[in-house]
Amino acid sequence: MKKIILATSNKNKIIEFKKILSELNINTISQKDLGICSIEENKSTFLENALIKARNASKYGFPALSDDSGLIIKTLNGEPGVYSSRFSGNQSNDIKNINMVLKKMLPFKKMDRQACMHCVLIYIRNPNDPIPIISSGTIYGKISNSISKINFGFGYDSIFFLPKKKKTISELTLEEKIKISHRGIAMKKMIKFLKNEKY
C-alpha cells in the first residue's frame, strides 16, 4: 500500500483529507505522527507556501501532500489571503481571526461582501521532485454579518455564506462540504492525477 505524508498539523484538514482519499489504496500519515515540525509559511502565494510545506515533509522518506488555503475578501484587497490562519496575530485562533474579519467588514455592512475561499494542493514525490503535481479549487460566496450558530466546520466556515445554499459552510455536513468546498474541488482533481500517475 502506498504511503503519503499529509503535510499539515491541522486536525480538521487531516479529517477531510482522509475522508476524501479513502477511495484510494493509500495509507495517509500526518506529519505530526512522524514528529515533523511545521515549517514557516513566509511566501506571498498559496502555491509557494504549499510547495515549501510539501518539500519539508517529503524529506522523511515518503511522498507528501500539502495544502495551503485561505479566505480572500474583495473589499479588503484580498485579505486575509495567505495570512488567513494568523490574521489576528501570533496568538491567533479561529475565533480571533473571525472576529478580526467581522471587525474589518463593519464599514461594508450594506456594501459588497463578496469573497472566495481558495485552496492549492501539491503532491511531491521527494524533496528534489522537479515535476510536482498541483491542483487548486475555489468557492465563491459572501461574508455574513455574524457568526453562524450552527458550526460543523472550522476556520472561516461559520462566516462564509453560500447564496445558492442559503447557509454558511459551517452548516453543511462533512459529506456536503467535501462535494462543494475549495479543498474538496482541489482534492477531486488531485485524485485524478494520483490514479493515473506513472512516475
Swiss-Prot record:
Textual note on the cofactor: Binds 1 Mg(2+) ion per subunit.
Gene3D superfamilies per UniProt: 3.90.950.10
CDD domains for this protein: HAM1
Cofactor or coenzyme needed: Mg(2+)
Key words, A-Z: Hydrolase, Magnesium, Metal-binding, Nucleotide metabolism, Nucleotide-binding
UniProt catalytic activity: XTP + H2O = XMP + diphosphate + H(+); dITP + H2O = dIMP + diphosphate + H(+); ITP + H2O = IMP + diphosphate + H(+)
GO BP field: nucleotide metabolic process; purine nucleoside triphosphate catabolic process
Residues that, per the record, bind substrate: T8, S9, N10, K11, N12, K13, S69, F154, G155, Y156, D157, K177, H182, R183
Gene Ontology CC terms, in alphabetical order: cytosol
Annotated Pfam families: Ham1p_like (PF01725)
Oligomer and partners: Homodimer.
Protein name stated in the entry: dITP/XTP pyrophosphatase
